[in-house]
Regions:
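Anion-binding and metal-coordination hotspots
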Residues: 1-317
Length: 317
């Protein structure tokens, strides 16, 4: 708490002196080694806890259900509480020496028990305005919105935020937009999640009729609002009779597809993401990404080179 108060006071003085404006705030993370070896890790079964991300989706799901009723006249029963009661469990590597550390395994990074330092840096002079720490197996996107909201509310009003592709998740575009924050993020490359020839890009979106048209010219109509651990999705589905007689069926459906009809899923926040990414070739967008690279990556580089961050060992959050 003492170090936190010192940090906040330094940031306050930087704001008073005009060194921090909130015009562009970049975010990134770097790994910090835990004071534990890989030999101390063991595979254990853990219960998946309902995280903050899941809690955030509650309000948006209710909003989406009301919109679904307006658009289709249908309303499915909300299943959020049911999903929260599910005792879903998974296996993860946990260190006996430091159980709070997380097993990090990322391309180009050292593998083993680590922590992640998540930092937000003001783009004027590279002043760090916010920081949080998580276990090394936590995705960068998990603490991001809480960190940005805390800075925006308690430190300095943020005009625009910038981040790399790890932070390009649909909910961020919606939440930051509602806060009045422009979001300049490097687009995340998305791979097709279907094992057939036709992907979602092969389906034409007809905004006026609120349908998707398949390569065979048949309509996929809005059926429901689906929810998973990764977010909220509109589900559009074709008529089974159309798919049964379609000459392109083998390119669109797997042989073992039990539905017998093609489905297309679209993020509930897709419009917010698209609105931001439409500006990705503008000078303002490109300049913000450059500032993030210079100040965020440069700040971590300086901390590792001059302040021993590359060699320090941590134990416990």
């Amino acid at each position: 708490k003492v170090f936190r108060r010192l940090f906040e006071e330094v940031v306050r003085q930087c704001i008073e002196k005009g060194l921090v404006s909130g015009r562009v705030v970049g975010a990134d993370s770097t790994h910090v080694r835990a004071n534990a070896s890989r030999a101390s890790e063991e595979l254990v079964e853990v219960a998946e806890e309902v995280g903050v991300y899941w809690e955030r989706l509650d309000d948006y799901e209710e909003e989406g259900l009301e919109e679904l009723e307006r658009r289709t006249g249908k309303r499915r029963k909300k299943r959020t509480k049911q999903l929260k009661r599910d005792n879903r469990r998974s296996h993860k590597r946990v260190s006996r020496t430091d159980p709070e550390a997380g097993h990090m395994k990322r391309p180009g990074k050292p593998e083993g028990p680590h922590y992640l330092a998540h930092q937000a840096v003001d783009g004027d002079y590279g002043i760090i305005v916010g920081q949080t720490v998580t276990a090394g197996d936590v995705n960068d996107s998990v603490p991001y919105l809480d960190l940005m909201e805390q800075i925006h509310t308690n430190v300095v009003p943020i005009q625009s935020a910038t981040a790399d592709a790890a932070y390009d998740f649909p909910l961020a575009h919606r939440v930051l937009g509602e806060l009045g924050i422009d979001f300049f993020v490097r687009p995340q490359k998305t791979a097709a999640r279907v094992s057939v020839q036709f992907t979602r890009d092969d389906f034409y979106r007809d905004e006026n009729r609120d349908v998707y048209l398949c390569p065979g010219g048949k309509e996929l109509r809005l059926k429901r609002l689906a929810r998973s651990a990764s977010g909220l999705f509109w589900e559009y589905q074709a008529d089974q009779r159309d798919c049964a007689l379609c000459p392109l069926r083998d390119k669109c459906l797997r042989e073992d597809d039990k539905r017998g009809a093609r489905k297309v899923s679209v993020s509930y926040f897709a419009a917010d993401r698209q609105r931001n990414l439409e500006r990705r070739y503008s000078p303002e967008y490109r300049d913000a990404l450059k500032l993030r690279q210079v100040w965020c990556e440069g700040s971590f580089s300086a901390q590792k080179r001059e302040h021993n961050l590359a060699r320090i060992l941590r134990r416990g959050l």
